[in-house]
Amino acid sequence: VRLLVPAAAAFAYLLTAAALVVWPPLVALTLAVTWPFDRNRAAAGRLLRLCGAFVSRTFPFWRIRIEGRWPAGRQAYVVVANHQSFLDIFLLSNLPREMKWVAKRSLFKIPWVGWCFTMSGDIPVDRGDPASAAAVMARARRYLSRGMSVMMFPEGTRSRDGKLLPFKVGAFKLAVDAGVPVLPIAITGTAQGMPKGSPWVRPSELRVRILDPVPVGAGPGAEAVERLRSEVRRRIASALGERAEG
């Protein structure tokens, strides 16, 4: 029995490596076929998320639970989630809707994986670069205007201990400027399943909890952004069983 866990993990790593080799050509082919009529690159993006979902389910000692439901209808959202681990990307790929991810540019430079992000229309950002931030916001607004949701981690980095970090305002300014609701998501278990800074996985129950959308309130822009930021963080903190400080 003791040999089964490392053997299963080794097999899962092999499947993951195989998926990372096979998927980019499939995403490229999908993009080539659909790009004339798919401005949002929804088909290519959805295929990439299926790869992420596949990877998240290859490891037998991860128990995945999706709680709550994505809201009905075709409304676009600024989707925000707490960030515990690199595993969050794979776990959130199990969600039923395509959305474009805002992620640090270094991820887009990873061979194969980064190419898929680019082909899928995800949005790279250079941290600390105001020009990059402005370009990201403009591109994200275009997606939202075409009915495509945009995914952001408002903490800006992964939490080392799984505790919620302060939220930056970018995602909430985007929602206010675009006039779209925020869809909060609470993640638990990924900090244990793949700790920050480690490529090795551990047994864990991975949970994604989809919370109720938070509408953009009335009032001056800066005040609306701050109210939205505070309310969304409060809801995610409550779902995680934490106090809403920060």
Where are these regions (language model features)?
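Membrane-interfacial terminal anchoring regions of lipid-handling membrane enzymes
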Residues: 1-33, 43-46, 226-246
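Hydrophobic beta-strand scaffold residues
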Residues: 63-64, 124, 150, 182
